[in-house]
């Protein structure tokens, strides 16, 4: 299928502009939080900035989807109850939305505008779909990587289209991701990346804060590397130890033959689905997210867009057994953990995980 002819042209345009608008809003908010924190006026327990960002981002994107595809359902992370019970918070959310709509008014014809609180509430609550294995729905994470967002570090706005349980389109806006983040040069390249994938077409990179949309034929195709030598491999993992088992992941790297003296330099810790983007663009080779408990189930919005980005860039994604992730099971994945890697090394990673699982407690 060519870059210019695919059946998701309109969906990609809407998703791109909505994610761009939401990314700009969340970037501005994140930057202001960091400034406030530096001045000492933001307390550690103050969750309102990220709450405002989550609500505003979800409202913008859900509204754009429903405006263009009224029969589509959306699986979103938030609902509007807290906002409806807090008038001050709702005012702040609406104010931010109106401001960003004015700044990106060239997008209004495609993604629409929100002008009152009731419409904001309604748009947020469009995200109440339960998903499933039949039909068509979108999966949205309005701010993926809350801690990174609050630190002014990595976070992402993630949107995927799922048809009959299969991801067919993904768009990830990474406001603080530089094009060559894993290189030795500190934050080299353009900051702010948009990563897109369409089933059967490929994965692509473009500048997030460049106005408008470019056809895929004008975007930069991205491909995973096929490194297999342990000395060449780079691993991306989460920052938060509560989200994945770093100790088990260390065992896996040892089993794969990583040199203990260099393994730290070969491991990159990043928040959010930014990890998938780094992998898909060939800057890393393995993504490890091993479960911290036997009962934890991943949310589909945390992985759907990243999943197609990896496949369309030539990689492979699975759970700890190597089985593909199932996005037709409702709002959560019925699987343990997530592992992504280039196709040359994927089976070896799964073999290492299997060996460690056999010799460990049932948790892994």
Curated annotation (Swiss-Prot):
InterPro entries: DPNP (IPR006239), Inositol_monoP_metal-BS (IPR020583), Inositol_monoP_superfamily (IPR051090), Inositol_monophosphatase-like (IPR000760), Inositol_monophosphatase_CS (IPR020550). This is 3'(2'),5'-bisphosphate nucleotidase 1. PROSITE patterns: IMP_1, IMP_2. Adenosine 3',5'-bisphosphate binds at residues 146, 243, 272, 275, 289, 302. GO terms for biological process: amino acid biosynthetic process; phosphatidylinositol phosphate biosynthetic process; sulfate assimilation. AMP binds at residues 243, 272, 275, 289, 302. It comes from Candida albicans (strain SC5314 / ATCC MYA-2876) (Yeast). The keyword Hydrolase applies. It holds the Pfam family Inositol_P. It catalyses: 3'-phosphoadenylyl sulfate + H2O = adenosine 5'-phosphosulfate + phosphate; adenosine 3',5'-bisphosphate + H2O = AMP + phosphate; adenosine 2',5'-bisphosphate + H2O = AMP + phosphate. It comes from the Eukaryota. Mg(2+) 3 binds at residue 77. The keyword Nucleotide-binding applies. Its EC number is 3.1.3.7. Its cofactor is Mg(2+). Belongs to the inositol monophosphatase superfamily. One of its GO terms (molecular function) is metal ion binding. SUPFAM superfamilies: Carbohydrate phosphatase (SSF56655).
